[in-house]
Design a protein with these regions (language model features):
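N-terminal hydrophobic or amphipathic helices and topogenic motifs
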Residues: 1-176, 196, 200-207, 232, ...
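Short loop->beta-strand "edge-of-pocket" segments that line small-molecule binding or catalytic clefts
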Residues: 129-138, 233-257
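Acidic, polar ligand-binding/catalytic clefts
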Residues: 179-217
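A ligand-binding cleft/hinge motif common to bilobed small-molecule-binding domains
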Residues: 183-198, 284-313
């Protein structure tokens, strides 16, 4: 078994530098990369330095030299290998790899927002026909895809800021955005939690909803726990460590609804009051890395990290808009794109998603949210209503 002789930790001096680039072709999001972590990921996945070099498009000699350089800089061995055995990262390298991946995943929405700002500046400089639509939304993996779709097909730039459902709706009321994304389960029984949280933020008549997508939320667990978990209470029953979502997010409301539905208290769920994350992907990474045993999220996030997915609830993802802004050109373009066949086809190919019942259509809130209390109409004056009929009957000598 072989380790490379490395420098002492006191010799290590490293700095972090972020750069961005313009490239020809389609937009590819805001994925950050680094040669060291690309190297470690390839070795972890393939178990061979030679195969890792092939997958990264470089020579064995170059990759080996790069590995030795990084070991000298970090003051720690990074790879363990011996003749005839799989190469694997050291414990230090694995800790480093997971820590970097977690930090990158946590920062992804903010980096995506920065990329979006830069892309908007370039688009506006190149073509002034591009419409800009400010969006604040609960995190959703389909929205990032929608952003690319409307940019390519509708000359529309979605300036998306991901945050909790409640904060997004507050931003809409404060006119920080034209559209706010939030999600609610297709369950009448969810009214106690969701209506309490959303009633102060959504006003029938003032707010309108636009159908965007349907998605399934469920438990994400590592495969060694898959046989134990069939329902939400199983997490508490088996004492699995749970990673929560931040307060104010729609998924946190869903978790609280599920706890209420199954008569669970915060103390029954290990980790409920501890570790929290802000996106589905960050929750999935926490589970995959072993920081937690279970979390709630969408199926696409679970599959991205090789986790088992236990479906729990189907949700509607809505885009809210003030009634007075429905005629805005950017909102009209968005509705048209959502109603088009391209968006429906995208959702059909995204695990755990499907098209909304009426994508792109402007919905009346009391119809879209069946648990929302309907506004009772004022009782009509019966005598006033009868007066015209009586007059008409008298004129024609009819009895009513």
């Amino acid at each position: 078994m072989r380790h490379t002789k490395v420098a002492t930790k006191s010799e290590t001096s490293l700095g972090l530098h972020l750069r961005y680039a313009f490239e020809a072709g389609e937009q590819h999001g805001a994925t950050l990369g680094n040669p060291l972590f690309d190297l470690l990921s390839a070795v972890l996945e393939l178990g061979s330095i030679r195969h890792a070099a092939q997958s990264l498009g470089c020579s064995y000699r170059y990759l080996w030299g790069s590995l030795r350089k990084w070991e000298q800089k970090l003051g720690e061995p990074l790879i363990i290998w011996s003749q005839g055995q799989r190469a694997r990262p050291t414990q230090f390298a694995e800790r480093l790899l997971w820590a970097e991946r977690r930090a990158r995943t946590r920062m992804q929405p903010h980096i995506e927002a920065l990329r979006s700002d830069l892309a908007r500046v370039v688009d506006e400089a190149r073509d002034q026909r591009h419409q800009l639509l400010a969006v604040q939304a609960s995190h959703d993996m389909a929205l990032s895809i929608l952003q690319k779709h409307v940019a390519a097909t509708a000359d529309l730039h979605l300036d998306i800021r991901f945050q909790g459902s409640q904060d997004a709706l507050r931003g809409l009321s404060d006119r920080q955005c034209l559209v706010a994304g939030f999600h609610v389960p297709v369950l009448r029984g969810a009214a106690p939690v969701f209506a309490k949280a959303l009633k102060p933020l959504l006003k029938p008549g003032r707010h309108k909803l636009i159908g965007c997508s349907r998605r399934t939320q469920g438990l994400m667990v590592r495969r060694e726990h898959a046989a134990l978990i069939r329902s939400f209470p199983d997490v508490a029953r088996h004492g699995l460590r749970f990673v929560n979502r931040q307060v104010g997010s729609g998924t946190r409301m869903l978790i609280d609804h599920l706890m209420h539905e199954h008569s669970l208290n915060p103390g029954d769920l290990p980790g409920y009051g501890g570790l929290t994350e802000e996106t589905h992907v960050a929750v999935a990474l926490c589970v995959a890395s072993g920081l937690a045993d279970a979390g709630v999220g969408v199926e696409a996030a679970a599959l991205e990290f090789g986790l088992q997915f236990v479906p729990l609830v189907e949700e509607n993802y809505f885009l809210a808009c003030l009634k007075g802004n429905l005629g805005h050109a950017a909102v009209q373009r968005l509705c048209a794109a959502l109603a088009g066949p391209g968006w429906c086809e995208i959702l059909k190919n995204l695990p755990g998603y499907r098209p909304a019942l009426e994508p792109g259509r402007v919905l009346v809130m009391t119809q879209a949210l069946p648990w929302w209390p309907k506004i009772k109409s004022k009782p009509k004056n019966r005598k006033a209503n009868l007066a015209p009929r009586i007059a008409a009957a008298e004129a024609t000598h009819l009895v009513i």
